[in-house]
Amino acid sequence: MAKHTLYLVTYDRGVYSTTGKTKPYHWLFFIQVNFGGEKNQGIVHQLRGMPGGFYYRGPEDLDLNKSGTLKEQLEVGEVDDSRLSRVHDILKDVRIETNESSTWNCQNWTLDGFEKLKAEGFAYDYLTAEAIKHWLREGQ
């Protein structure tokens, strides 16, 4: 049975034009299914939208090498071929904040999802949400 590496990936979203401060990075899950040459293809699970209108669309195909402002790629676990759909089943049930004035974002969703994936053995036991936040923080 083939195993695929599970990553947390961040994207740089630039800076706020009014303050010059770095915007929070966009975080997502990436399951690498084909790597070699110029390809880094896989399945993405990410939160989309804006505060008050966030949604999870489900698995999306993506080649990370062609995906824009990639910042970091942190290996967090493995997924067997036969369990790829279980990742979606877990992530579709992760709570999404609907309060428009909240500071909650894709990073919160990803960390909540990480804990659920870890509980089912997809993510490495030694990783913690605090360590991930530190490694993937803005402004490094």
Please report, for each region that a protein language model flagged, where it lies by residue.
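Active-site nucleophile-His-acid catalytic modules used for acyl/amide transfer and hydrolysis
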Residues: 64-140
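Phenylalanine-focused residue identity feature
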Residues: 29-30, 35, 54, 114, ...
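Generic alpha-helical secondary structure signal
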Residues: 11, 15, 59-60, 110, ...
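Cysteine protease-like catalytic core of ubiquitin/ubiquitin-like
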Residues: 33-78
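Surface-exposed beta-strand edges and their flanking turn/coil or helix-capping segments
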Residues: 21-23, 56-61, 88-91
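Intrinsically disordered, low-complexity segments enriched in small/polar residues
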Residues: 5, 9, 53-54, 120
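Alpha-helical structural elements
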Residues: 2, 6, 22, 50-51, ...
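N-terminal accessory segments that precede or flank the first globular/catalytic domain
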Residues: 1-48
